[in-house]
Amino acid sequence: MICEDILKLTEYGMVTGLVPKEDERFTINRLLELFELEELDEDAVVAYQSRTPMSREEAEESLEELLNRLLDYAYENGILKENSVVYRDLFDTKIMGMLMPRPGEVIHKFQSLYEKDAKAATDYYYTLSQDSNYIRRYRIRRDMKWTAETEFGELDITINLSKPEKDPKAIAAAKLAKQSGYPKCLLCKENEGYAGRVNHPARQNHRIIPVTINHSDWFLQYSPYVYYNEHCIVFNGKHTPMKIEKATFGKLLDFVKQFPHYFVGSNADLPIVGGSILSHDHFQGGHYEFAMAKAPLEKEITFAGFEDVKAGIVKWPMSVIRLSAPDTERLIELADKILLTWRGYTDETAFIFAETDGEPHNTITPIARKRGNNYELDLVLRNNITTKEHPLGVYHPHAKLHHIKKENIGLIEVMGLAVLPARLKDEMAQLKTAILSRADLRSNEVLSKHADWVEEFLPKYESITEENIDGIIRKEIGLVFREVLLDAGVYKCTEEGREAFLRFIDTVNKQKKVFIRERDSG
């Protein structure tokens, strides 16, 4: 059976285009070596030769089961030392690495396609990243996804189930493992081809694409967890910290010029309002239109000296200034002016403080896209101040929402996609049963945190049944995410909040000469 599976995996490689026909024997021999075999079983060869060749669809569908059989064999024969998710993932990545073209071949193919069409190049690379099992299609399919209708548009909700939970043995082994500084982080270019270890994923099946952004060396890859279509990561070739500055806007727009079918954005560069990785400069993008991108302007505004740039406040729960123009240099200049003003801006009546005790609080989450002949920049104003009442952040999901979402509101959430914790899948199922049976949620250790929320929304519905309960729970989770975004907005969607927002716009318009002097002196 093992020999038959080695042949089937080789066929998978050829059907998907990972393995050229000329490399068939070579690939079989590499897999024999990996599984400590000296030859193919003759019966397996006969069975393989008499098979009906698999289609691409069959190849994709069969990969998980095929790898599981190979992993089981490896464990039963002492090749794989632990039979847990972490160790199985390390070994099946090694298996898939045997099928992969070398980095230079992938880059050459990408670049030759790019010369004709940028989309054709990313289509090839995205398919490769899935066929290689770097993006595990069969795990991504397990994610729960739905949309929630709000006055701000359709918000995307996802419960991420594709990121495996670490098992206790792996956690214990990771604590005992020698601490390594190689690669420095999960984004570094040194991950390409790396074998991994118990506390760092294997990446033998990973290929990255070099891109030049603003005359510096960057790389393109996809997220292995694809929260949305073609979820890509664009990262600096150097392990250098995140920083939002004038050059950031130039880099984002330069990337969009090269890949006009993609949007790209950056997480903010401060804790609480930033992403999970602040140590390595990177952007996230993809081929997807979020609710925020679809949102219209609530109010058009004019920036003095930039009358050629269309600008406005976006109808969105967070505080977003949208700039649009065909000339990217004009966008960069105005975005920089807004950023510099915001960095130093304090409005005590609106509870916005540029800094307290020397700690800066104001930053921006920027997003770039091409729309028709114009380039767009969405500048989301952020502030990470904390108080005794809100120790995790004033402009962060407040405590009453933590039963659904308490993690940072990063770039993806800002644009309208909730990435919710895996625990919610089971909790939703338990909530359904408890609500239908009228059970006491407060006496349930797992569900008690949801009790206030459920008691608040139940009266809205005349009748809750087996048929409509799932839809109701999903809808209400979506409305919680709406509240999360409203909490994260520095200017609230009220008359008072909008007046405060316009005070900031007025301040930007008064800053022209000051900023010219500041840059000249720097």
Kindly give the residue locations of the regions a language model identified.
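Helical scaffold of the NTase/Pol beta-like nucleotidyltransferase catalytic core
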Residues: 205-208, 237-264
